[in-house]
From Swiss-Prot:
It is found in: Cytoplasm. It comes from Ruegeria pomeroyi (strain ATCC 700808 / DSM 15171 / DSS-3). The active site is at residues 8, 129. Its main location: cytoplasm. One of its GO terms (cellular component) is cytoplasm. Keywords: Amino-acid biosynthesis, Cytoplasm, Histidine biosynthesis, Isomerase. Gene3D superfamilies: Aldolase class I. The keyword Isomerase applies. Pathway: Amino-acid biosynthesis; L-histidine biosynthesis; L-histidine from 5-phospho-alpha-D-ribose 1-diphosphate: step 4/9. Coiled coil: none annotated. It comes from the Bacteria. This is 1-(5-phosphoribosyl)-5-[(5-phosphoribosylamino)methylideneamino] imidazole-4-carboxamide isomerase 1.
Length: 240
């Protein structure tokens, strides 16, 4: 199972939110590229980047720090937030991004997801952010009637590389991930699932790894910044 350190970008800085509330942002590093290099030095194999402003604006906002990370870090990175058309997908992949994460458009324009997955095999993931089992879009600001598993299954044959499943009520709360919901989703689809939201300790990571659903990976942010999770130790434990 791959551990993805998260760098959430707001106003050019690396921050963490609680439950996705933009007014509850804690700045952890005003130099996101330096933060990324710290994670790489600790041995991470991937980086998970989110353009928070972009998620609300519907277009890239924090392009400069993302580009700096891509230029300076030699590990693959995935990015979500504000990627809602083919031109933006192509632009990011041309700049060296390994994988785009499509969230809002997966609900509003699923054909774009399928088109992108066909055009760029292995480089398109679907981000499913949920509150109480229902999908939320536009930076988690809008809740839909779409159920998580229904949305995931609709992309079963689309060729997407992964589903990144975030439980909004767990995100940034340091209360542990929603292991049951994540495992249920992973069992329901053949697409690799990456867990996000609530990972707060090494025990949480081990529980996800051992949940019996063959998760592809887990994303952690606040726990790494707060020191509740030691990245080197976590990477070693997951390899072991």
């Amino acid at each position: 199972m791959i551990l993805y350190p998260a760098i959430d970008l707001k106003d050019g800085q690396a921050v963490r939110l609680v439950h996705g509330e933009m007014d509850q942002a804690t700045v952890f590093n005003d130099n996101p590229a330096a933060q990324a290099l710290e994670f790489v030095a600790a041995g991470c194999e991937w980086l998970h980047l989110v353009d928070l402003n972009g998620a609300f604006a519907g277009e890239p906002v924090n392009a400069a720090p993302v580009e700096a990370i891509l230029e300076q870090c030699k590990v693959p990175a995935q990015l979500g937030g504000g990627i809602r058309d083919m031109a933006t997908i192509e632009r990011w992949l041309d700049k060296g991004l390994a994988r785009v994460i499509l969230g809002t458009v997966a609900v509003e324009n699923p054909d774009l997801v399928r088109e992108a997955a066909r055009a760029f095999p292995g480089k398109v993931a679907v981000g499913i952010d949920a509150r109480n089992g229902r999908v939320a879009t536009k930076g988690w600001a809008e809740e839909t009637d779409v159920m998580v598993t229904d949305l995931a299954k609709s992309f079963e044959d689309a060729g997407v590389a992964a589903i990144i499943y975030t439980d909004i009520l767990r995100d940034g709360a340091m209360k542990g991930p929603n292991i049951k919901a994540t495992a249920d989703l992973a069992r329901a689809v053949s697409i690799p699932v990456i867990a996000s939201g609530g990972v707060s300790s090494l025990e949480d990571l081990i529980a996800l790894r051992d949940c019996g659903a063959s998760l592809n990976g887990a994303i952690s942010g606040r726990a790494l910044y707060d020191g509740a999770l030691d990245l080197k130790q976590a990477l070693a434990a997951l390899k072991g």
